[in-house]
């Protein structure tokens, strides 16, 4: 399963670990992904999404139906 938020599109980025001696080694900064089930009243079923806490706040603000319509418009299956 890919490490991408289904709502915001946030994905891993790369950077460096920096030691006290200023040595740089490659690392990945991973998004804080959570798996969450949402009840969709219009479809009378649960929808499971993999999203970040910011994605959850967006759903709280806009509603699950509006966010699902946006996800489906991008061609993702939910």
Swiss-Prot record:
One of its GO terms (molecular function) is structural constituent of ribosome. Residues 1-21 are annotated as: Disordered. One of its GO terms (biological process) is translation. InterPro entries: Ribosomal_bL28, Ribosomal_bL28/bL31-like_sf, Ribosomal_bL28_bact-type, Ribosomal_bL28_sf. Pfam families: Ribosomal_L28. GO terms for cellular component: cytosolic large ribosomal subunit. Keywords: Ribonucleoprotein, Ribosomal protein. The keyword Zinc-finger does not apply. Belongs to the bacterial ribosomal protein bL28 family. This is Large ribosomal subunit protein bL28. The gene is rpmB.
């Amino acid at each position: 399963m890919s490490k991408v938020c289904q709502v915001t599109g946030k994905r891993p980025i790369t950077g460096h670990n920096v030691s006290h001696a200023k040595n740089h080694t490659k690392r990945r900064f991973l998004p804080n992904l959570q798996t969450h089930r949402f009840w969709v009243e219009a479809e009378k079923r649960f929808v499971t999404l993999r999203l970040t806490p910011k994605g959850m706040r967006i759903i709280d603000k806009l509603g699950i139906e509006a966010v699902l319509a946006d996800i489906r418009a991008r061609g993702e299956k939910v």
